[in-house]
């Protein structure tokens, strides 16, 4: 016999299941092999040994290739992850169809944290909204104070400002 309590408990189960379905795919993480680098903040990861997925690094922005420190940022990204197995936490899809994600390196650090710590990237406040962004911002502050990487320059220009100051036309 169906009692009001049974209906409520089944209703709760369905409500919880429905809410879980609505969660963004940000909670999904998958392993893959880094097989390529487009620039400092875009990598290609081989998923399941067959699918190439272009990943835009969540929450940070590296200098553009034609910008000061751009080539060094690309080389740092290559050194840190090419040929390594990583875990990709999908956050979003950008307007170019790339997966936006957090890359967990072997050893437990994120690629984002490493690039920011080495002074090869800025935390991008407009897009970095997750709790981990606070840690990355602290790492950026330490790199800035220590004049590490791009912070050696007197006034480094964030890539988002550089792109929209007319330099994107020179690419």
Question: What are the functions of these language-model segments?
Answer:
Residues 2-15, 19-171:
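Small beta-barrel nucleic-acid-binding modules, primarily SNase/OB-fold domains
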């Amino acid at each position: 016999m169906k009692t009001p309590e049974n209906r409520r408990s089944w209703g709760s189960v369905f409500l919880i299941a429905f809410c879980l379905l609505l969660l963004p795919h940000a909670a999904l993480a998958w392993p893959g092999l880094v097989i390529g680098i487009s620039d400092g903040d875009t990598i290609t990861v081989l998923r399941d040994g067959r699918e190439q997925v272009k990943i835009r690094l969540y929450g940070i922005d590296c200098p553009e290739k034609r910008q000061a420190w751009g080539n060094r940022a690309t080389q740092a990204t290559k050194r840190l992850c090419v040929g390594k197995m990583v875990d990709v936490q999908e956050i979003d899809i950008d307007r170019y169809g790339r997966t936006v994600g957090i890359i967990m390196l072997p050893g437990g650090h994120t690629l984002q944290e490493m690039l920011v710590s080495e002074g090869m990237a800025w935390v991008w406040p407009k897009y970095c909204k997750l709790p981990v962004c606070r840690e990355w911002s602290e790492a950026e502050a330490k790199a800035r104070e220590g004049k590490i990487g791009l912070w050696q320059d007197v006034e480094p220009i964030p890539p988002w400002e550089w792109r929209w100051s007319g330099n994107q036309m020179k690419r």
